[in-house]
């Protein structure tokens, strides 16, 4: 592969155009891909998802794996309320964290589709999410529904950003990404008795409140907040001195092209990195926290670190995790190593082509584009497609030295920007 040097691209003036640099137009996976295309919304489809005039949209932050999910002890909740599901705790936590969907959302949908969690019958264990998924088996349905919710959520955000960039009104109907994702999924499974007619989001909100005691004022949000939130999100980038690269200071690793968390669709929130991109069974190296924050161990192979500001980073395909839930870490604290064994790297299933770290950027539980994000002195330009490795479009720009660094070339980690 030939890597060309290029000058840093000028930043567009509009935050919506800035965000559009991260919209997906295809691409080929190098290391990690769920294999499903992005969910595409249209005006016609959205016309079928109108909120009832008396309904309020759901709070995005309670839909996503953000502060509320991080404070939720899923294993303890299942032990008390659903002992038959306790052995599924890590599986639920892992995939909820991977798709960054609050596990409370999943449990609420289970109750709506198959009844109380306390004593599920054989049918409920085989198909806990009923007609919301065409898959069979507990694990398959759980992952399928989380994947559907994620695709719908980010597909809606992408559609809104395109509309805003075209100077079309967005958010005025009060429909936000969380509401669109859940409403669309529930109406897909409308033959299930729990969501026949009426307001399926109302039934969802009531069930959520009953299960977790969340006040309506927290679960719902005013309609007029939707457009403001979109505009704020379009211009998001972490503070330039908050993060470093996720490997040891003083070392050089090779990152690949930016891509979505799943390898297809929007936003380009992630990149994969490895010391030397070896085969399975080869030596692997230390993964460190890119910034200070609180640890959440999502599974044996996945960790998240969340800064008090709401910025977070996710670390997947891990091994030898040496931090624990609630632990406070600083930048460059060792979290573990990236796994050299495929079964360890994919501790709850999935796909991967070889040993590497899958690294993602989030804000308040939502995956956000790496466009313009700084890691030490390097500012990222994400390119125009998933896994875009062309250095004319995707690169790390060293703001101190004025140099451009391409994909699959060693990238030195000097630490945090001064």
From Swiss-Prot:
Propeptide: 32-236
Cofactor: Zn(2+)
MF (Gene Ontology): metal ion binding; metalloendopeptidase activity
Keyword line: Disulfide bond, Hydrolase, Metal-binding, Metalloprotease, Protease, Secreted, Signal, Virulence, Zinc, Zymogen
Primary localization: secreted
Note accompanying the cofactor annotation: Binds 1 zinc ion per subunit.
EC number of the protein: 3.4.24.-
Catalytic residues identified in the record: 317 (proton donor/acceptor), 356 (proton donor/acceptor)
Residues engaged in binding Zn(2+): 259, 272, 358
Pfam families per the UniProt record, alphabetical: Peptidase_M23
Sequence similarity: Belongs to the peptidase M23A family.
The protein's name: Protease LasA
Gene name linked to the record: lasA
């Amino acid at each position: 592969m030939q890597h060309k040097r290029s000058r840093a691209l000028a930043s567009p003036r509009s935050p919506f155009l800035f965000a559009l640099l991260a919209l997906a137009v295809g691409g080929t996976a190098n290391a990690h891909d769920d294999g499903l295309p992005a969910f595409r919304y249209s005006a016609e489809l959205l016309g079928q998802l109108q909120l009832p005039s008396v309904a309020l949209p759901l709070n995005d932050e309670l839909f996503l794996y953000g502060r509320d999910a991080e404070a939720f002890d899923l294993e303890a909740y299942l032990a008390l309320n659903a002992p038959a599901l306790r052995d599924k705790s890590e599986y639920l936590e892992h995939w909820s964290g991977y798709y960054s969907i609050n596990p409370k959302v999943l449990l609420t949908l289970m109750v709506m589709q198959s009844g109380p969690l306390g004593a599920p019958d054989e049918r409920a264990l085989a198909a806990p999410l009923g007609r919301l998924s065409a898959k069979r088996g507990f694990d398959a349905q759980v992952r399928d529904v989380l994947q559907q919710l994620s695709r719908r959520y980010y597909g809606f955000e992408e559609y809104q950003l395109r509309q805003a960039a075209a100077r079309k009104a967005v958010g005025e109907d009060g429909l936000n990404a969380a509401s669109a994702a859940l409403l669309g999924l529930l109406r897909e499974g409308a033959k299930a008795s729990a969501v026949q007619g009426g307001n399926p989001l109302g039934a969802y909100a009531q069930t959520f409140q009953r299960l977790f005691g969340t006040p309506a004022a927290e679960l719902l949000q005013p309609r007029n907040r939707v457009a403001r939130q979109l505009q704020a999100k379009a211009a998001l980038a972490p503070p330039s001195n908050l993060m470093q690269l996720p490997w040891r200071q003083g070392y050089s690793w090779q990152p690949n092209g930016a891509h979505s968390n799943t390898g297809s669709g929007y936003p380009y929130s992630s990149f994969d990195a490895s010391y030397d991109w070896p085969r399975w069974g080869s030596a692997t190296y230390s993964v460190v926290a890119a910034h200070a924050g609180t640890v959440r161990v999502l599974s044996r192979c996945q960790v998240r670190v969340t800064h008090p500001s709401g910025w977070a980073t996710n670390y997947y395909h891990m091994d030898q995790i040496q931090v624990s839930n609630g632990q406070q870490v600083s930048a460059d604290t060792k979290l573990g190593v990236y796994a050299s064994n495929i079964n360890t790297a994919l501790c709850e299933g999935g796909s991967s082509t070889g040993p590497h770290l899958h690294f993602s950027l989030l804000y308040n539980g939502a995956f956000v584009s790496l466009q313009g994000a700084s890691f030490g002195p390097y500012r990222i330009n994400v390119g125009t497609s998933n896994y875009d490795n062309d250095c004319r479009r995707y690169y790390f720009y060293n703001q101190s030295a004025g140099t451009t660094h391409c994909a699959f070339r060693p990238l030195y980690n000097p630490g945090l920007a001064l």
